[in-house]
Amino acid sequence: MNLTPREKDKLLIAMAAEVARKRRARGVKLNHPEAIALISDAVVEGARDGRSVADLMQAGAEVIRAEDCMEGIAQMILEVQVEATFPDGTKLVTVHNPIR
């Protein structure tokens, strides 16, 4: 399988998000990389589904609650930027204060 660096990054995000989902389902609090992966995956998949940038900026902030994360993680992550592929091209999506 020959993947471009961009495709490898997308695959890594998807895998990390899957690990984070399993841990959250077991009641384990998420760490920084897991929280970022879940938010990023939600944005990338939403773009693939054809959702708008504005919609994903809002939806990305609803993926994780502060109580799902280890202490201090919500305050540490002030924004998440994800480059996602939309039907009309690649765009940078910024989710401000993603963990509330």
Swiss-Prot record:
Keywords: Cytoplasm, Hydrolase. GO terms for cellular component: cytoplasm. Its main location: cytoplasm. Pfam families: Urease_gamma. SUPFAM superfamilies: Urease, gamma-subunit. The keyword Signal does not apply. It catalyses: urea + 2 H2O + H(+) = hydrogencarbonate + 2 NH4(+). Gene3D superfamilies: Urease, gamma-like subunit. Its EC number is 3.5.1.5. It comes from the Bacteria. It is found in: Cytoplasm. Pathway: Nitrogen metabolism; urea degradation; CO(2) and NH(3) from urea (urease route): step 1/1. InterPro entries: Urease_gamma, Urease_gamma/gamma-beta_su, Urease_gamma_sf, Urease_subunit. GO terms for molecular function: nickel cation binding; urease activity. GO terms for biological process: urea catabolic process. The keyword Hydrolase applies. It is an enzyme of class 3 (hydrolase). PANTHER family: UREASE (PTHR33569:SF1). Belongs to the urease gamma subunit family. Heterotrimer of UreA (gamma), UreB (beta) and UreC (alpha) subunits. Three heterotrimers associate to form the active enzyme. This is Urease subunit gamma.
